[in-house]
Amino acid sequence: MSNESKICLVNEDSIYYRGYDIKDLTAVSSFEEVSFLLIYGELPTERELIEYRSELQHYRYIPESLKQVLERIPIYAHPIDVLKTACSFYSTISPESKQNDIYRISNRLIGSFPSILFYWYHFSSNGIRINTLTEVNDSFARHFLKLLNRGNNNNINNNNKFTTEQDEEPILEYVKALDVSLILYAEHGIETASTFSCRLSASTGSDVYSCIGSSIGTMKGVLDDGGSSEAVMYLLQPMKSPEDADKKIMKMINNNQRIIGFSNEFDQRTPIIKEWSKQLSIINKNNNNNNNNNNNNNNNNNNNNNNNNSEDDDDDNSLQTISERVEEIMFDVLKVHANVDFYNATVFHQSNIPTLLFSAISVIARTTGWMANIIEQRCQSKNSLPSLIYTGSDPIPFTPINERVYYHNFKIPNSNL
């Protein structure tokens, strides 16, 4: 397996996709444009970007046969397993070939993964079969958030069908924050386990679906880059205040418990997504204040003053404030830094995305980087496996079964479970 790549550079200054700084890409680009850059090696022209977006939009539709599969997956399944199942299913109905090459397959998977995720999520949650098509001009991020909101009962007509006119328009800042998250998750070099996995699979000559399936399975682990945002939210959600965070984090530190969302090295992506987390916190606070003001129009001045004090208290105990306190404690005590998963979790939560789906978002975004790495690996080398140092026993003679000493606590599993 090759140890050279032109796709992603991670250093102390920043992270670069094909030479472009992610600070610039998140400020002025879009996920679709970055996806094209990673897979095709250059930024698209205006015409190329229009055609690429059209190709991704084409695959928002998912075939009826796949819908039947998704409807059989139970609600307690992990969303990452849902995407992996869909990927494997596509390999059976549309296998890789000269006509159906890696570029077409990449468009299919990237374009259809949000549709797959939300078709399964809404059906398994409340039996709703959503229409996975949205407006032609909807960006990838806007399309994603519209599908998320299609599970609301208020959006369903009598025939249990959706029309695009009924979609609730997502808040612009939510769309941009998700777009930035997708860009930041799109690639992070071969140092990540999921990218190493896809390149290793590609080096064997395996088909693209198998390479992506391998990476998806690896991403399910909370220790892989992008796989821990879900665990971060489960850590933060029970914390009611910065003081509560102090107690719980210090208890975990004293008990030598692993705290997800932190690493020894500074993550250049964290300040970018943290800033968006702050913006969403302000927007949500203002929306809540407006709702409170509307509800309190008939209250007297004394009650209004009490409500204002309550709003200040809520601000002190907001998810953003608690998150920043946890980050502060972790650096002061352990000298570790919050990684991109930490504040992506707060961005997703403030955008009303269910915690269960957090890790699946990183899979959808990282598919672009995996595809780029598969293409590059295929061009560079054949199979090459990492070596291991054997630490087992020296050669020993075979012991007859009646002479063996029992020392294992071995139990045969109950086959009825």
Curated annotation (Swiss-Prot):
Region: Disordered, residue numbers: 284-317
InterPro entries reported in the protein's UniProt record: Citrate_synth-like_lrg_a-sub, Citrate_synth-like_sm_a-sub, Citrate_synthase, Citrate_synthase_sf
One GO-annotated biological process of the protein: propionate metabolic process, methylcitrate cycle
Biased composition (Low complexity): 286-309
GO function term, MF aspect, one: 2-methylcitrate synthase activity
Cellular component per GO, a single term: mitochondrial matrix
Source species, domain of life: Eukaryota
UniProt similarity note: Belongs to the citrate synthase family.
Protein name: Citrate synthase-related protein DDB_G0287281
Species lineage: Eukaryota, Amoebozoa, Evosea, Eumycetozoa, Dictyostelia
